[in-house]
Amino acid sequence: MGCCSSASSAAQSSKREWKPLEDRSCTDIPWLLLFILFCIGMGFICGFSIATGAAARLVSGYDSYGNICGQKNTKLEAIPNSGMDHTQRKYVFFLDPCNLDLINRKIKSVALCVAACPRQELKTLSDVQKFAEINGSALCSYNLKPSEYTTSPKSSVLCPKLPVPASAPIPFFHRCAPVNISCYAKFAEALITFVSDNSVLHRLISGVMTSKEIILGLCLLSLVLSMILMVIIRYISRVLVWILTILVILGSLGGTGVLWWLYAKQRRSPKETVTPEQLQIAEDNLRALLIYAISATVFTVILFLIMLVMRKRVALTIALFHVAGKVFIHLPLLVFQPFWTFFALVLFWVYWIMTLLFLGTTGSPVQNEQGFVEFKISGPLQYMWWYHVVGLIWISEFILACQQMTVAGAVVTYYFTRDKRNLPFTPILASVNRLIRYHLGTVAKGSFIITLVKIPRMILMYIHSQLKGKENACARCVLKSCICCLWCLEKCLNYLNQNAYTATAINSTNFCTSAKDAFVILVENALRVATINTVGDFMLFLGKVLIVCSTGLAGIMLLNYQQDYTVWVLPLIIVCLFAFLVAHCFLSIYEMVVDVLFLCFAIDTKYNDGSPGREFYMDKVLMEFVENSRKAMKEAGKGGVADSRELKPMASGASSA
């Protein structure tokens, strides 16, 4: 199982004949068994938390005395107000829902079980008393009768903080949540440390709420633009590079110009007739416009410099995009692969979060310093948290690796099928079938290696965040260096893993053998890898920039109409981030296809020479691309010792549509 092999095995590997798609065998079975055992452990954690009553406490909620709302409870020893009958009290109500513990990120307000949530704001204790008499829902402590709300001297402690915000029950979780956004703004202050002025945060969140329809529309626009770009890649890949280049130039110039124009316009606008609140909003918008304009200018200059350096290599990318476009023509379901992966990730994340919430309410009841009940796990079971966190990383990486193996298997099937008319009816489903039958162990091993690197990096990032504001600058610098090194190692391993999955899809070898073979082939074709990855990835990056710029420009024009009464700094950031994520999800599949095609090509040229019986599998356009790339690099004096072998044309029947 080790990745290290003897010299004899290495020699045998170098002499081994590659037989694409011919021999299929199970790979890395012990790692599949280990992964299955790990998943059984994850299931045990979920089952344990449900069996110990955590599910009822999570869904129905419980008060500060350990009573579950909506049912009869048993008496807890030495705990006052425990063992109460809450059959008619089905909702959890917090006396002060905005009172947050900023250290432990949890509400430290007293929680009670009530019959109904106050749908309207209650400004006085008389209103609270009237609400209890009309609705039969007592909002003060169990020890205080409704008739004593306005007369008892303990009302200020045992009753909710005034004014009581209007609230509504959270669906399925029976908690009374304030409907006023100001409480959530205060909660966000615990997470957003860079905001020191409460009013700024309130204005930002109000800007998001005011512009929510525009934000939703712009997010849909980014999705439509991404799908349109994928269609363009499929059908007009030959002119796509030039279209992207021109549009990015126009988009970056236009966006930068509009930002400076809006900044100058708003700076000259009269401010004598506006209210103080509108003046503050205008100043926030003016400051944001200046930051955006300067950032856009710097980005545009850097982008132009990069395009100036790479202008001679742009033409070489056209052929590569053309071949990759053919793959999407024959395998149209590849476009939807990110949706299935995202759907699987969302399902797992929902399960993981639900189990995490179960764990947060499981354990034995313990009385804290304030006399209230907390549930804590003691003994070895308290380490289930760590097991659960490792499961989040490993299984998430496993799902992403399954996508890589599925895409690699489908593209490998396309590349090594000489007559494209003989392709399987659904190459994607055929690839999924091979993955499930043969290669789940390889995917489990590759994702585990990424997990081994990601966990230490996350631990170091947490330690680094805890050292912020401390005087030990040397320790922070060392930690930052270690984090950067682990990040680089993780990216390199991700790239190597992807190529290892491709080698496994081609020749059905285990992970270590595939990784070694892929690494050797990539090293032998280092110059070609540099050319293809640099130019191809840069053009895909331009596609992402185009989508973000287009969505951001539309957002600027739409949100500009609301500049007098809302701050659109945060809405614009949300829209641009979502646009980038959507574009990345779509174009990452295209990038993956390009990488798989290149490794297939490198293996093809290494083990075939065009002679009878050893004909090339590759597309003629791909051969022309690499040959032109090699000539261009030789002319630039960067080719080194180039391969002098002439690329021979494909055998009959190898051409693709």
From Swiss-Prot:
Residues 635-657 are annotated as: Disordered. InterPro entries: Choline_transptr-like. The keyword Phosphoprotein applies. Expressed in various cells of the hematopoietic system. GO terms for molecular function: antiporter activity; choline transmembrane transporter activity; ethanolamine transmembrane transporter activity. GO terms for cellular component: cytosol; extracellular exosome; membrane; mitochondrial outer membrane; mitochondrion; nucleoplasm; plasma membrane. The keyword Aminoacyl-tRNA synthetase does not apply. This is Choline transporter-like protein 1. It comes from Homo sapiens.
